[in-house]
């Protein structure tokens, strides 16, 4: 896990996303309201370059993330998933892929909007959307019901807070570096005003980060004990320690160094401390990259049956019911499908009827609809299913409860060649 390339790609992508969005927040919300900012057009140009660098890196790392994820899903090389359509299946048939397309459009739009300094609302709105959309493809976006909605809102606020503070730090360092070298009248007063505004934005962001971080941990951990007994919990614990060190540095910046502006020593120390915060913040993002590769302890489900080594398997979870779907063998050709329907406490769900619908990859053919037969052990089975092609299929389980209620559960499933 330590050398997992996908985790590092995720970290780099989040860093680039925070850089682009955070720089927009800093330029519009912190620098923009300061009247004297109009006297420094060169600074605005440098901020725009910083945004474009972040957007370019986020597009590059986003494409790498998509291809690497497709390779992991299909168990193929990077070259094969690019040449044989695996990456396209992930892009066209999954929520993650749709979000990638939407964020690509937002990146292009944001890159153009920063050229229009008179418009403040649109760049901030585009930057915020670009920043929070990954939450819809995260654990929060996959959690069903009201609890999932709360988790999703919390995740979005967590990302916005990180962007307003950590993402804006490179722009703040750029401002301090420019101020340190400037000889132009008005720079000192301008730097003091901007630093004070940013310090208050940082205070609000830290408060929101702590509140949403606690809520997210409550949703993702099975209990406090998981912080030292599980890999997932230990990574969250390390993240908390790093965040605490960043808050300590930010406290020194606000209460010790900011009042001493505009002395050169204060500017130099603020710049040095902000660079330290950026370094620690990137370490936090690396941990986030690895956390996304692990199953949250609150989401770990006990295996109800032994999954055959050649089978394709997916677990579908909704507030009304859960389904474990096993396709054996999990490759193109003829297979048998076993469906176990249960409640959230893993007791058997008393269903009147169960139907199985299989949708082929990228709408490349007609759907297959089957009536499942109940087995003596309580599972439901469909025999002799002909899977015409490999790729990312969509499985839908339609459960008719004893009360007559219809419950639809759907999820992607990978069929090998």
Region annotations inferred by a language model:
Residues 355-371:
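Short amphipathic beta-strand segments in non-cytosolic proteins
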Residues 361, 375-380, 417:
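Short, surface-exposed linear segments at secondary-structure transitions and domain or protein termini
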Residues 342-343, 367:
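A generic local structural motif
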Residues 1-341, 347-354, 381-383, 390, ...:
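Polytopic transmembrane helical bundles with strong interfacial aromatic enrichment
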